[in-house]
C-alpha cells in the first residue's frame, strides 16, 4: 500500500440499527383551543402509538424513547431505532398522520445509523456474533432521567484536516478520545450514530444519564482532547427530561 493510500484509508464501520431523532415544537395556542375531551382523546391515541411501537423493543427488533426538551429549540424529542430505514419512515409517517402531529411543528430531525468504527476494534471472528458488540449496535435505549443530543463533524480545514491523517494517527487519537468516554462508564451511556450521506453532519451523539451535570463534565473534558480541540465541529445541543406513559399526560395538560 502506497503512502497516499495509507493516508486516505477510510475507517471501516460496523453498522446496527437505523436511528431517527424527531424534534417537535407544540402549537400550544391551537392545543388550548380544543376541549378537554378532545385533548384526552388525542393523548390516548398517541400513547397507543407509543405502546404499539414498544412491541418491537420487547421483541428485540428496535427501541424508542421520548423526552421533553428544555429551551426554545423544541418541546419534545422522539428517538426511534429500527432495523431498516423503511421502518423508521413508517413510524415517522404514522406519527405525522396522528391527531397530535396536527398540533406540532417540526423543529429538527436527524437520520443516522448506530455505528462502531475499526479505530478501536479488537478481537477475532465475526464481530456481529460478539454479544458485547451486538449490545452496542442494537441497544435498548435506557430509561435515564436525562438526554443530551448533538451532531458533529470532523474538521477538514488547512492543517486540521482529519481526513488527511493516516489511519495510525487517527486510531491513536481516537484511542485517547475513547478513554475519556470510558471514564464515564456507569454515569453516562453514549450512543454514536453515523450519518455521512444521511444528514447534514457526519455523526450524531446521544448521551443518557441520571445526573444531567455529567453531560457538561464529559463534553467539557473532551474539549481538551486533541480530537475535539483540533478536529471537532459541533451543531446544536438538545437537552431534555424523560417522558413516560405516566408523565406524558401531565406534559400535554393545559
Curated annotation (Swiss-Prot):
Its cofactor is Fe-coproporphyrin III. InterPro entries: CHDC, ChdC/CLD, Dimeric_a/b-barrel. It is an enzyme of class 1 (oxidoreductase). It catalyses: Fe-coproporphyrin III + 2 H2O2 + 2 H(+) = heme b + 2 CO2 + 4 H2O; Fe-coproporphyrin III + H2O2 + H(+) = harderoheme III + CO2 + 2 H2O; harderoheme III + H2O2 + H(+) = heme b + CO2 + 2 H2O. Keywords: Heme, Heme biosynthesis, Iron, Metal-binding, Oxidoreductase. GO terms for molecular function: heme binding; metal ion binding; oxidoreductase activity, acting on the CH-CH group of donors, oxygen as acceptor; peroxidase activity. The active site is at residue 150. Pfam families: Chlor_dismutase. Its EC number is 1.3.98.5. The keyword Heme applies. Fe-coproporphyrin III binds at residues 136, 150-154, 177, 190, 228. GO terms for biological process: heme B biosynthetic process. Fe-coproporphyrin III acts both as a substrate and a redox cofactor. Pathway: Porphyrin-containing compound metabolism; protoheme biosynthesis. It comes from the Bacteria. Belongs to the ChdC family. Type 1 subfamily. Involved in coproporphyrin-dependent heme b biosynthesis. Catalyzes the decarboxylation of Fe-coproporphyrin III (coproheme) to heme b (protoheme IX), the last step of the pathway. The reaction occurs in a stepwise manner with a three-propionate intermediate. This is Coproheme decarboxylase. It comes from Bacillus velezensis (strain DSM 23117 / BGSC 10A6 / LMG 26770 / FZB42) (Bacillus amyloliquefaciens subsp. plantarum). The gene is chdC.
Amino acid at each position: 500500500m502506497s503512502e497516499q493510500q495509507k493516508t486516505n484509508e477510510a475507517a471501516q464501520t460496523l453498522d446496527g440499527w437505523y436511528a431517527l431523532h424527531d424534534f417537535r415544537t407544540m402549537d400550544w395556542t391551537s392545543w388550548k383551543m380544543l376541549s378537554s375531551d378532545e385533548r384526552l382523546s388525542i393523548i390516548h391515541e398517541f400513547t397507543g402509538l407509543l405502546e404499539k411501537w414498544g412491541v418491537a423493543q420487547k421483541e428485540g427488533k428496535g427501541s424508542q424513547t421520548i423526552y421533553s426538551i428544555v429551551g426554545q429549540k423544541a418541546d419534545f424529542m422522539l428517538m426511534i431505532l429500527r432495523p431498516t430505514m423503511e421502518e423508521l419512515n413508517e413510524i415517522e409517517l404514522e406519527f405525522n398522520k396522528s391527531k397530535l402531529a396536527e398540533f406540532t411543528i417540526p423543529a429538527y430531525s436527524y437520520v443516522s445509523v448506530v455505528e462502531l468504527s475499526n479505530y478501536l476494534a479488537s478481537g477475532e471472528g465475526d464481530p456481529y456474533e460478539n454479544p458485547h458488540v451486538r449490545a452496542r449496535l442494537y441497544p435498548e435505549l435506557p430509561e435515564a432521567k436525562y438526554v443530551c443530543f448533538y451532531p458533529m463533524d470532523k474538521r477538514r480545514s488547512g492543517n486540521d484536516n482529519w481526513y488527511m491523517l493516516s489511519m495510525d494517527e487517527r486510531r491513536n487519537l481516537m484511542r485517547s478520545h475513547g478513554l475519556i468516554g470510558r471514564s464515564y462508564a456507569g454515569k453516562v451511556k453514549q450512543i454514536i450514530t453515523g450519518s455521512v450521506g444521511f444528514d447534514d453532519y457526519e455523526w450524531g451523539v446521544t448521551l443518557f444519564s441520571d445526573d444531567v451535570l455529567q453531560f457538561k463534565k464529559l463534553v467539557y473534558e473532551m474539549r481538551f482532547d486533541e480530537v475535539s480541540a483540533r478536529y471537532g465541529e459541533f451543531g446544536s445541543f438538545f437537552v431534555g427530561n424523560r417522558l413516560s406513559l405516566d408523565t406524558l399526560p401531565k406534559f400535554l395538560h393545559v
